[in-house]
Amino acid sequence: HDYIQAAIERGAVAIIGEYTIDLDIPYIQLKDAKKALGYLAAAYHNFPSRYLTVIGITGTNGKTTTTHLMHSVLNAATKGKAGFISTIGADFGEKNVDTGLHVTTPTAPEIQSYLATMLEAGLTHVVLEMTSHGLDQGRLAGVDIDVALVTNVTHEHLDFHGSFQAYRDAKGLMFQM
């Protein structure tokens, strides 16, 4: 809600948010605006994950390594038709992109844009590293997962999640996609 006025000044014709506010343009109040953003981004890109085989990988440790190993195997098996999105970059087939993040899952609009680009490039499989923060914050909403893999779950990120149960629940969101 911190940027609503700036969005209106830049030409926004409608706003989606979580709190009751009075605006002169249409306002849709939702329980989880971040999750809605994921589905809106997916719709904007014509739901690219529906046309790809998406392998989601999460865990406390080993996500990035497992993502890259799985990508290598799939890329060989599909003759170059596999890509990946991880915390350190994305592979679009013929092109590698530094996501600039190196710590967590990209935003929902970025993920959907990457998936759409991969689909347009003729890829058929994508390995997607999924952090607990990204899952909890709805950044992966709108991504259809075909295969879900968990490397491990140990006591980490409790500063963000508050408890081990909440951390485990965030990881479990992957199985609802």
Located regions from the model:
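N-terminal leader/targeting and accessory segments in enzymes
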Residues: 1-39
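Phosphate-binding loop of NTP-binding sites
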Residues: 36-177
